[in-house]
Amino acid sequence: MCCSERLLGLPQPVEMEAPDEAEGLPSKQKEMPPPPPPSPPSEPAQKLPPQGAGSHSLTVRSSLCLFAASQFLLACGVLWLSGHGHSWLQNTTDLISSSLTVLNHLGPVAWLGSGTWGIPSLLLVSLTVSLVIVTTLVWHLLKAPPEPPAPLPPEDRRQSVSRQPSFTYSEWMEEKVEDDFLDLDAVPETPVFDCVMDIKPETDPASLTVKSMGLQERRGSNVSLTLDMCTPGCNEEGFGYLVSPREESAHEYLLSASRVLRAEELHEKALDPFLLQAEFFEIPMNFVDPKEYDIPGLVRKNRYKTILPNPHSRVRLTSPDPEDPLSSYINANYIRGYSGEEKVYIATQGPIVSTVADFWRMVWQERTPIIVMITNIEEMNEKCTEYWPEEQVVHDGVEITVQKVIHTEDYRLRLISLRRGTEERSLKHYWFTSWPDQKTPDRAPPLLHLVREVEEAAQQEGPHCSPIIVHCSAGIGRTGCFIATSICCQQLRREGVVDILKTTCQLRQDRGGMIQTCEQYQFVHHAMSLYEKQLSLQSSE
């Protein structure tokens, strides 16, 4: 059956004339209308399909329906295995029913004519569809399910929230790489205990209130300090204090912990933040329980009420009234130096208004030749009182006169003279200004340069130099970084190795919380790695 017989009733195409021939004809012939279309017969003849066509061939329409059905079954199988098959099957069935209803009303379409496919075409379509179905099912079955994230063990909870350092390896050298700087939130110098204490103004020594706080709420300033109110071994009645097993174990750790690092080990460890983080959190803080101090009015002498001097090493001021323990109190500790030498440094808090006179009493009493200040006057809030004069001031009979101020890129050096009666002394005051607010420096060379300058100034004082006073705001974070860097530089020069872990433990024995944050602990390792490289270059030259 030919196509012209099937498509009866449709207008037949008119044969178009060539342009050349049409131009040569008379105008009357050009305007002749086309012959009228033949009228459709009243009863179109219907031809039967060829014998055997239904059993050995497949129409285009049926082939497309078969292909669509196979794809539908494939999608059903995949979605059924994934758990969404039931709802998807119902929705798709409704859609197909609606589509078939619309197609039935459209009538025959020219391209779905009587064309047939032979058996080879049918086999090719079936083979292709089967191959697609089998490949998809095998891929779905062989695909490994995603592994659920492993929960962190309880002891790693604190490590998981630790900040990344605000410096990179490329920033240890003198050149700065702008792309390496990380914009991080502020790191508070805050010890970690179990609950949070709300601190009243310094003039109001009222009772303290305790409330629960999440970790993110603690990340403020040093005012939001924490306090363990349930220390094992603490006697609730009275002020008696017993050493708990936990504290005894912490004391043993501080005495025995050590990890000697050679040059290559130091460089590798400085680049491993996870190892440094795990090591830092193993070191006990060794903070002082406030119950150890039963001194009325002590709150007026401390900048932060939970950062107190460890009793065995604290500095005691000479006082004309031995019955008044408050007059001899200052929040400061003697710190041992390289090889355990006693009273090499004094770590203290940044003076407040009520302790400026006590601070200068300590400077005169200890015959201090050098003061190192590593904080700004204000960083979000007050960190230190400006305890030195513009020109001259007198505190407790000590006349303090600023002779000269030297400005450098990273610090300011004040040459100060002290006079009491007929005795006169000289004092160097280094104010390190390159430590950024609430985080560690981006570069280590400025701190190493300051350490070298202070060491040279101390050597000029002779072999028996009096203690060097170092302070920041609380007297434990940046102060600990400076003292640890100074001690480790001496060890690296003399022994060729360095033990930062042992140095940190020694500092915390003398004053709790020294090197206060993990970021500061990493920074000390980076500074020492850079210093070792500098020593290697000098020796090779």
UniProtKB/Swiss-Prot annotation:
Consult the record and explain the modifications the protein receives after translation.
Phosphorylation at Ser-221 by PKA deactivates PTPN5. Phosphorylation at Thr-231 and Ser-244 by MAPKs stabilizes the phosphatase, dephosphorylation of these sites results in ubiquitin-mediated degradation of the active phosphatase.
- Locate the region Disordered: 1-55
Please tell me where substrate binds in this chain: 437, 472-478, 516
Q: Where is the composition biased (Pro residues)?
A: 32-43
Mark the residues carrying the PTM Phosphothreonine. 231
Against Gene3D superfamilies, the record matches this protein to:
Protein tyrosine phosphatase superfamily
Where is it expressed, tissue-wise? STEP20 is expressed only in the CNS.
Record's signal peptide: none
Reactions mediated catalytically: O-phospho-L-tyrosyl-[protein] + H2O = L-tyrosyl-[protein] + phosphate
- UniProt GO molecular function: phosphotyrosine residue binding; protein tyrosine phosphatase activity
Residue numbers annotated as active site: 472
Q: Which UniProt keywords apply?
A: Cytoplasm, Endoplasmic reticulum, Hydrolase, Membrane, Phosphoprotein, Protein phosphatase, Transmembrane, Transmembrane helix
Q: Supply the PROSITE patterns for this chain.
A: TYR_PHOSPHATASE_1, TYR_PHOSPHATASE_2, TYR_PHOSPHATASE_PTP
**Which residues does the record list as Phosphoserine (modified residue)?**
221, 244
Residue ranges occupied by any Tyrosine-protein phosphatase domain in the UniProt entry: 276-531
Extract the CDD domains matched here.
PTPc-N5 (cd14613)
Which GO CC terms are listed, alphabetically? endoplasmic reticulum membrane
TM spans, by residue?
Answer: 64-84, 122-142
What EC number is given for this enzyme?
A: 3.1.3.48
* Pfam family of the protein (one): Y_phosphatase
Which family is this sequence assigned to? Belongs to the protein-tyrosine phosphatase family. Non-receptor class subfamily.
User: So what does this one do?
Assistant: May regulate the activity of several effector molecules involved in synaptic plasticity and neuronal cell survival, including MAPKs, Src family kinases and NMDA receptors.
The name under which this protein is listed is Tyrosine-protein phosphatase non-receptor type 5
Which species is this UniProt entry from? Mus musculus
